[in-house]
UniProtKB/Swiss-Prot annotation:
Domain HTH gntR-type: 1-55
Protein name according to UniProt: Nta operon transcriptional regulator
Organism: Aminobacter aminovorans (Chelatobacter heintzii)
Keywords: DNA-binding, Transcription, Transcription regulation
Function according to Swiss-Prot or TrEMBL: Probable regulator for the expression of the NTA monooxygenase subunits.
Superkingdom of this protein's organism: Bacteria
Presence of the UniProt keyword DNA-binding in the record: yes
UniProt xrefs under Pfam families: FCD (PF07729), GntR (PF00392)
Location of the DNA-binding region in this protein: 15-34
GO function terms (MF aspect): DNA binding; DNA-binding transcription factor activity
């Protein structure tokens, strides 16, 4: 529900109503809501409860722009510093995913993040990696939205690794930029469509939080 925008951005979650709808007790529901808050899908305010996350396109743009800049720099450093063996290990990590069969959306996202962390790690710059990890935590919510494109991401990751192995620094940096920009464009498109839907859905009888 949180990912599919069942709740309007900023809307307060009615725990009693939601528990009845899902046919669960308040305790497991509260645990689930706390977990969703930790993962960035919801926000919480003391003495007021849980709220659907507000969509902040400008902030997302800034974070994705920064991420693209940093990862381009990282792959340039990786082309210069990573050993052939280290690049081979990264490629093996990707190939192992081909043999893992069907996996959940959550696992797809974890593997996607892990690839980018390993890629940036090849720059041998720990502060760069820490910054990219921090950005990933802040955009994880948005990346959930676009989880259906993970198969395409996997193919692009393999291409990035091939360019890295061939030490094609400029081409690799350009491809990483296009890779990140494409996902951001897809996320924005999905968000725009979702916002249009949730604000026109049941417009004659909007739901009220109790």
């Amino acid at each position: 529900m949180a990912v599919s925008y069942h709740f309007r951005p900023g809307e307060r979650i009615n725990e009693v109503e939601l528990a009845a709808q899902l046919k669960v007790s308040r305790t497991p529901l509260r645990e689930a809501l706390n977990r969703l808050t930790t993962e960035g899908f919801l926000t919480t305010t003391a003495n007021k409860g849980f709220f659907a996350r507000v969509l902040e396109a400008n902030t997302l743009f800034d974070l994705y722009e920064l991420r693209a800049f940093l990862e381009q720099s990282a792959v340039r450093l990786a082309c210069q510093r990573a050993t052939d063996q280290e690049i081979a290990v990264l490629r093996d990590f990707l190939l192992e995913q081909d043999e893992s069969g069907e996996i959940s959306a959550g696992e797809m996202l974890k593997l996607d993040e892990e690839f980018h962390f390993r890629l940036v790690g090849l720059s041998q710059n720990e502060e760069l990696l820490k910054t990219v990890r921090s950005i990933s935590e802040r955009i994880r919510f948005a990346r959930w939205i676009d989880w259906q494109s993970r198969r395409l991401s996997h193919e692009q990751h393999l291409h990035i690794t091939s360019l890295l192995a061939d030490r094609k620094e400029d081409e690799c940096a350009a491809f990483v930029l296009a890779h990140i920009q494409k996902h951001f464009d897809q996320i924005l498109e999905i968000i725009r469509g979702a916002v249009t839907e949730i604000y026109t859905r049941n417009s004659d009888s909007p739901r009220k939080a109790r």
